[in-house]
């Protein structure tokens, strides 16, 4: 099966990476190689692309595709999570890089491949692991976690106002039978949310599925650490581009980038800074970049995408 993934905000991302032909660039989420391919087109034989993805299938399918695009530039592909960018660079004797890209969306391939269990529109085993080597699955969470912990996950990671009822219904349902598939979970969620609240708006299971995916893959903790390590790796003038798809991720990126721009922790009443923390970067755009109408028509999944860009000082 070919890895189908339409890159989001492609033109805007490539433009903001400000690619140098001899530069070193990290794509922390290779996916279908849409962004990676465009980066490679702009590199010469002195340039390097480091592509990471915790989905083994993405790495396998990208290898051949990328070599066909540019056989002269150095291509390093690693089946790992982007949280390990420092270790990957150390292993390859790379001290600093010119640009880093993270596209935090679940790829169209993963959404469409039923067996991954990411989609509430297709019945499949409850999995949701980006990296199939991981032990924690959505099935384990809904069948083994306590009601309060399930409620916390759905409330905090899904921003779901019906989190308490959904958690209660999950715990009741599993007393009768283990919850094994996405279809079973969708039915439980629909039963938990009053019909009046389900009229209009997104699919009733959307927020709960998002929450479980974030919990299974520790997405928010990993993101904050990667921003810290990635900024450290960047050369002065190097850029960090991150595409988010929901408010939780965007808030973390916004807050972490702002810490790099204004790291001072002195009380506001202090006339001068005494903490000694120096800015590490500047925001390239004050507001996030969002897709143009034309892109939304061609790719509705891009609707919630936001791109934020930090430039290292």
Swiss-Prot record:
Main location group: cytoplasm
GO molecular function: rRNA (cytosine-N4-)-methyltransferase activity
The keyword Transferase is annotated on this UniProt entry: yes
Gene Ontology annotations of biological process type: rRNA base methylation
Localization per Swiss-Prot or TrEMBL: Cytoplasm
E.C. designation(s): 2.1.1.199
Positions annotated to bind S-adenosyl-L-methionine: 33-35, 53, 82, 103, 110
A GO CC term assigned to this protein in UniProt: cytoplasm
Pfam families membership: Methyltransf_5
Catalytic function, reaction form: cytidine(1402) in 16S rRNA + S-adenosyl-L-methionine = N(4)-methylcytidine(1402) in 16S rRNA + S-adenosyl-L-homocysteine + H(+)
Alphabetical keyword list: Cytoplasm, Methyltransferase, rRNA processing, S-adenosyl-L-methionine, Transferase
HAMAP family: 16SrRNA_methyltr_H (MF_01007)
Physiological role: Specifically methylates the N4 position of cytidine in position 1402 (C1402) of 16S rRNA.
Similarity field: Belongs to the methyltransferase superfamily. RsmH family.
The name this protein goes by in its record: Ribosomal RNA small subunit methyltransferase H
Annotated gene: rsmH
